[in-house]
């Protein structure tokens, strides 16, 4: 089975000693399915993981990502800026790419020159110049981004800031009048600036180029056909900082949701705008918790708070939120 999958994914079937990645494109009557294949050698043989990307579900629009109304207004204001870096952070599989593609769709206009550098290109978009990284041919994130800056782009999307070179070029692009969108692996929004400094970017460059950070997670949505309302225990409510007597819903399972109690997913978000106060904290080398305190004081909702709002609204369960967020 693994050999057949590797053939379909254009992966070297004779190589079983190192990890490999590939791609399978399946066209059906109604949609195009993109399968990402990852192999990993173990002591018992190769482990194969398939990740399904449905091209038809890529452009869901900002209003369908799970952003609260006030958060959508904030995001619209952020991406309307002419220059600066906007980072989307979170672990693998947290919906970062979907958020970036939704933002690109919002920004896409015939007169706007948008160029992306991706590895891999997950979804093809009309009217946007997308570049596939090919390290074997020498086309790295850094090399592609360096060339992009000579193409007079208005907006630039870099799939991921992986190294110092890419980070330096992203900062340079932002400081020379481009809006740069990218992703980073951090646990929360305030940690993004610290991560850039740790990578080797000078604090004054981070503070002057970073526009905003959006941290996110995905939670499963409760099936509205079978969810069951209950009152949150007082101790739990006290621990979470929500009013006593608050109600939430728990999953039950039915035919509609195939017995899981859940149907669909929604994002929860932590949006930090980098204003003058936070810029000064970055310049001073402040710790992440200090930056977080200032951001909260200025109105930022943490991932936990955003998740609890969805719990109280009946969108997801308390267990889902506690599983993906920290207090």
Give, region by region, the residue ranges found by the protein language model:
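Short, flexible helix-loop junctions that flank or precede catalytic/ligand sites
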Residues: 1-327
């Amino acid at each position: 089975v693994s050999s057949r999958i590797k053939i379909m994914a254009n992966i070297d079937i004779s190589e079983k000693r190192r990890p490999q990645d590939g791609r399978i494109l399946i066209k059906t009557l109604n949609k195009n399915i993109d399968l990402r294949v990852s192999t990993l050698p173990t002591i018992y043989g190769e482990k194969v993981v398939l990740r399904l990307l449905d091209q038809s579900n890529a452009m869901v629009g900002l209003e369908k990502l799970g952003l609260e109304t006030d958060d959508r207004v904030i995001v619209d204001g952020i991406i309307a800026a002419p220059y600066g870096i906007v980072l989307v952070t979170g672990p693998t599989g947290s919906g970062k790419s979907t958020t970036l593609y939704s933002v690109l769709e919002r920004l896409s206009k015939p007169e706007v020159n948008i160029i992306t550098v991706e590895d891999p290109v997950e979804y093809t978009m009309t009217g946007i110049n997308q570049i596939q990284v090919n390290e074997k041919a020498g086309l790295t994130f850094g090399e592609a981004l360096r060339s992009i800056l000579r193409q007079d782009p208005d907006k630039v999307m870099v799939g991921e800031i992986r190294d110092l070179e890419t980070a330096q070029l992203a900062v340079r692009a932002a400081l020379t009048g481009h809006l740069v969108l990218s992703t980073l692996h951090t646990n929360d929004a305030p940690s993004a600036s610290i991560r850039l400094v740790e990578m080797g970017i000078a604090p004054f460059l981070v503070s002057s180029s970073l526009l905003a950070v959006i941290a996110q997670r995905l939670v499963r949505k409760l099936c509205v056909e079978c969810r069951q309302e209950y009152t949150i225990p007082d101790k739990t409510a006290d621990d979470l900082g929500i009013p006593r007597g608050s109600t939430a819903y728990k999953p039950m399972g039915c035919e509609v949701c195939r017995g899981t109690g859940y149907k669909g997913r929604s994002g929860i978000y932590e949006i930090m705008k980098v204003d003058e106060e936070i810029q000064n904290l970055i310049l001073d080398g402040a710790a992440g918790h200090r930056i977080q305190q200032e951001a909260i004081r200025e109105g930022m909702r943490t991932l936990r708070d955003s998740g609890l709002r969805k719990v109280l609204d009946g969108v997801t369960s308390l267990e889902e939120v506690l599983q993906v967020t920290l207090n």
